[in-house]
Regions:
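Histidine-anchored nucleotide/phosphate-binding helix
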Residues: 29-42
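Short internal beta-strands
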Residues: 47-54
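Short connector loops/turns at beta-strand edges and beta->alpha or beta->beta junctions
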Residues: 10-16, 41-45, 175
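Conserved oxyanion/phosphate-binding beta-strand-loop segments in alpha/beta enzyme cores
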Residues: 1-8
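Conserved small/polar residues in nucleotide/adenosyl-binding loops
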Residues: 195-198
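Hydrophobic alpha-helical positions that pack around
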Residues: 3, 60-186
């Protein structure tokens, strides 16, 4: 309760050869929306913003379709599931600057400023978008939320190494036998990840 709070998704994937976020946005945008809705409910936020690369027009189109479907079913908008919880999401096309992958630079860009990192503290969780509490995570993090709730935190933790829990999606590219996306348990070596891909 209290001040307006925001959920922000950093979908401005800018690393050369990276397309993990793009595959989720184009292939399963509902998983991202579901994670943001759950996070919004938990944090008491009423608005979500997806900051997406402008160079991903198909991803933006698929997100818009998924958001329209969610609104039609009552998963976005006012009084979700009769709980009194209001939550909606909008998309903001990124400005194309690599630095906007840094959370405070992304927030500056959302506010219409030049996407430059800001000094921390304050951290976005306390003073983020428009100086209000902001939860900012990437596509993969939000997309994992519903799976973790459905299967349990321990099931996610069991997929990783002792000190690095869960799994991670990587884009394999370059001088390797077979490129593409691979999801592997945390702690797995790059060599073993490539072997699993072949």
């Amino acid at each position: 309760k209290g001040a307006q709070k925001y959920m922000v998704c950093n979908a401005d994937e800018g690393d050369p050869g990276a397309f993990m976020d793009r595959s989720v946005l184009e292939g399963d945008p509902h998983s991202l929306l579901e994670g943001m809705i759950i996070g919004g409910f938990a944090a008491g936020a009423t608005e979500g913003i997806i900051y997406c690369r402008a160079e991903y027009p198909l991803a933006i189109a698929r997100l818009e379709i998924a958001m329209a479907q969610a609104r039609e079913k009552g998963y976005l908008g006012k009084n979700l599931f009769g709980t009194g919880f209001d939550f909606d999401i909008r998309i903001k096309a990124g400005a194309g600057a690599f630095v906007c992958g840094e959370e405070t630079a992304l927030i500056a860009s959302l506010e219409g400023e030049r996407g430059m990192p800001r000094l921390k503290p304050p951290f976005p969780a306390a003073k983020g978008y428009w100086k209000l509490p902001t939860n900012i995570n990437n596509v993969e993090t939000y997309a994992n939320v519903a799976w973790i709730i459905a299967n349990g935190g321990q099931a996610f933790a069991d997929r990783g190494a002792e000190k690095s829990k869960g799994s991670k999606v990587f884009a394999l590219a370059g001088k390797i036998k077979k490129g593409g996306l691979v999801e592997v348990p945390m702690g797995m070596t790059l060599k073993r990840s490539e072997e699993r891909r072949v």
